[in-house]
């Protein structure tokens, strides 16, 4: 983000990865709405979406494949002397830290109000994912060998680091 950006937060823009539990998308939107309302009350500038998407399984998003809610927010680049905005105001470093602080406190308040419901959704989602009715039930993936043994070993190492079950034949 450049200095003339403001503050970016969820929800992400389309496309959304279709392998993410719908409850996580629901909770992400609830957290984003509460955070937006906190910024609106203070008349702070922010935006959602733009380059922030949840298709690529990396950055703040990877945790959602493990059942956790990933929350991304970023403050524009800031110098210790502040940044002059296009309309002439100066945004100080102190203000940018305040944005991060308010976002964090708002996220904690949302979590406090919704902890039991979030745990229930998490538990129900985990049970479904390993059930015989899951869209992931009875799936097997085969990786055919090639002459590039290093690439195959690297993939195996990464999958095993994530506690995935592998059968070597």
Please describe what each predicted stretch is:
Residues 58-62, 125-131, 144, 154-155:
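Generic recognition of flexible, low-complexity loop/linker segments
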Residues 76-78, 82-134:
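Catalytic cores of secreted or luminal carbohydrate-active enzymes
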Residues 73, 104, 159:
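Divalent metal-coordination and catalytic microenvironments
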Residues 67-70, 136-140, 161:
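Active-site lining segments that contact anionic ligands and/or coordinate catalytic metals
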Residues 91-94, 107-110, 146-161:
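Long hydrophobic segments that form regular secondary structure
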Residues 133-150:
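Short hydrophobic beta-strand segments
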Residues 1-93:
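Functional cores that coordinate and move charged inorganic groups
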Residues 167-169:
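Conserved small/polar residues in nucleotide/adenosyl-binding loops
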